[in-house]
Amino acid sequence: MRFKNTLFLLLIFSSSSILSSQQYIDDLGSEFHKKKRQEFREQMPQNSIAFFFTAPIMKRSNDTDFMYHQDPNFYYLSGWREPHGVLVIFKDDQQDNNGLYNEILYVREKNEYREMWDGRRLGLNGATQ
């Protein structure tokens, strides 16, 4: 009996660490999201800007959060699954010192200390892929 209990606990701890280390898989692909942003942009009025915000993190109790679920509209247009992000879509091309752009995705930077508590973040490099 003790062997079964030990085996059961070992199985639980090993499976939870495997599941928590998995990466995001976007089955739709970046081209799908890019196409949907372009279709949305074509329907926008002239000289307009659209803002899309990620879903908030919902607290279960003082110490735990519910499993995070991204806002479907935000995910549909961006493919981004992490909290604390903003997608800005411009109808017309904008220009700055770096060139032309018509959309901006604001995301959290990588932070090893916070990742220890909140989980892995893709950061700026992950957003550009």
Task: Please name every model-derived segment.
Residues 2-5, 9-12, 20-129:
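A composition/biophysics-driven feature that prefers long, compositionally simple stretches
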